[in-house]
């Protein structure tokens, strides 16, 4: 089983852009050296707790600092980009990384980002994402066209476009060709329509964990959509995000986790988000408890939401998740702000990739 890293980035709002840039590059190096397979970076323009508006800048800067790890924007919010420009950017960046790149796409789920880009809400964004991606695919195909859609326009020059000039067109298509470019989509709610859309197009699924039943529904929704279009689903392509903290003992891991940036993020930021998207009921059901989401505290999180403990304990928790939810190919660690005390966090990441996941029984 692979290890992945999701650099959302869940940073303290007081951090400067330079602090986040330097922290991001350090995390990429730590994950690469530890043996992580993938490093994914969020894209948000207005969220003080998730403040990386340009993931491609982090990816480009991290390219020469790392050797094996793959990078992805997770995700480029397509309605907010010019499709032709983004298609060229994605292709060129994948060439810089010589294949250590894949692409996450999304419509955008935060109203403040939508307002910044001139939308009153997020309602129309999904349709715009579909159109944007269709135009990006045409640009990558490198065949002459000119198209004005409902929301965007794009084209690709050919020999008849400017016959009076002999122009050699740059090849900024994805490294290895379009078929070599993996596209991934995240799912949040049960029976996610986003993952259905992904399955119909042979894109890879990423499940934001909201309990075992939700996780299983994410895979089943994606797999059924894959099969409906003649594709073959495989659990090795299924990724799931989790909160993880590992130390020598369960007690030490719990102590470190509750003193970490992960605890601060949950206390001040993630509690409202999980309540907004109704993610707690599935987690409460998994715990076998009859409580209201308002009763959830840090101890509940450490026991039932975070994968927190010794390497052996975390291994057991992952195996229990696999048994109850059907399996996955990659566990993705959610990123948290541990700039002020990074070493326990780095140790946890290293132990996950080197001591825990290689020993997880996947069947």
Swiss-Prot record:
<dbReference type="InterPro" id="IPR036661">
    <property type="entry name" value="Luciferase-like_sf"/>
</dbReference>
<dbReference type="Pfam" id="PF00296">
    <property type="entry name" value="Bac_luciferase"/>
</dbReference>
<comment type="pathway">
    <text>Terpene metabolism; (R)-camphor degradation.</text>
</comment>
<feature type="binding site">
    <location>
        <begin position="186"/>
        <end position="194"/>
    </location>
    <ligand>
        <name>FMN</name>
    </ligand>
</feature>
<comment type="function">
    <text>Involved in the degradation and assimilation of (+)-camphor, which allows P.putida strain NCIMB 10007 to grow on this enantiomer of camphor as the sole carbon source. Catalyzes the FMNH(2)-dependent lactonization of 2,5-diketocamphane via a Baeyer-Villiger oxidation to produce the unstable lactone 5-oxo-1,2-campholide with (R,R) configuration, that presumably undergoes spontaneous hydrolysis to form 2-oxo-Delta(3)-4,5,5-trimethylcyclopentenylacetate. Is also able to convert (+)-camphor and norcamphor to the corresponding lactone in vitro.</text>
</comment>
<comment type="subunit">
    <text>Homodimer. Likely forms a loose transient complex with a P.putida flavin reductase that provides the required FMNH(2) to the enzyme.</text>
</comment>
<dbReference type="GO" id="GO:0019383">
    <property type="term" value="P:(+)-camphor catabolic process"/>
</dbReference>
<keyword id="KW-0285">Flavoprotein</keyword>
<protein>
    <recommendedName>
        <fullName>2,5-diketocamphane 1,2-monooxygenase 2</fullName>
        <ecNumber>1.14.14.108</ecNumber>
    </recommendedName>
</protein>
<feature type="binding site">
    <location>
        <position position="74"/>
    </location>
    <ligand>
        <name>FMN</name>
    </ligand>
</feature>
<dbReference type="GO" id="GO:0005829">
    <property type="term" value="C:cytosol"/>
</dbReference>
<dbReference type="GO" id="GO:0018684">
    <property type="term" value="F:2,5-diketocamphane 1,2-monooxygenase"/>
</dbReference>
<keyword id="KW-0503">Monooxygenase</keyword>
<keyword id="KW-0614">Plasmid</keyword>
<keyword id="KW-0560">Oxidoreductase</keyword>
<dbReference type="InterPro" id="IPR011251">
    <property type="entry name" value="Luciferase-like_dom"/>
</dbReference>
<dbReference type="InterPro" id="IPR050766">
    <property type="entry name" value="Bact_Lucif_Oxidored"/>
</dbReference>
<comment type="similarity">
    <text>Belongs to the bacterial luciferase oxidoreductase family.</text>
</comment>
<keyword id="KW-0288">FMN</keyword>
